[in-house]
Amino acid sequence: MMKQQFFLFLAVIVMISSVIEAGRGKEIMKNIKEKLTEVKDKMKHSWNKLTSMSEYACPVIEKWCEDHCAAKKAIGKCEDTECKCLKLRK
């Protein structure tokens, strides 16, 4: 009888520690999610700041714009941080 109570006691301790660890796991995942959200917001803010200055943004955007418009069979041109696709005449 004493052995059964001892093993039951150990099982309860293991279950309690598992529940505690599961709670910590959620806490850790929440912290990771918050950090990733902060990083995303900082990157978005930096990109918006960069693209607000057209003299810096156009060189960054231009290559993407050329490729984007080439897929549409057009010529890509960056104007005021916006990609303009000019249609090619046949």
Swiss-Prot record:
One of its GO terms (molecular function) is toxin activity. Residues 1-22 form the signal peptide. Keywords: Disulfide bond, Ion channel impairing toxin, Neurotoxin, Potassium channel impairing toxin, Secreted, Signal, Toxin, Voltage-gated potassium channel impairing toxin. It is found in: Secreted. This is Potassium channel toxin BmTXK-beta. The keyword Disulfide bond applies. Belongs to the long chain scorpion toxin family. Class 2 subfamily. One of its GO terms (cellular component) is extracellular region. The keyword S-adenosyl-L-methionine does not apply.
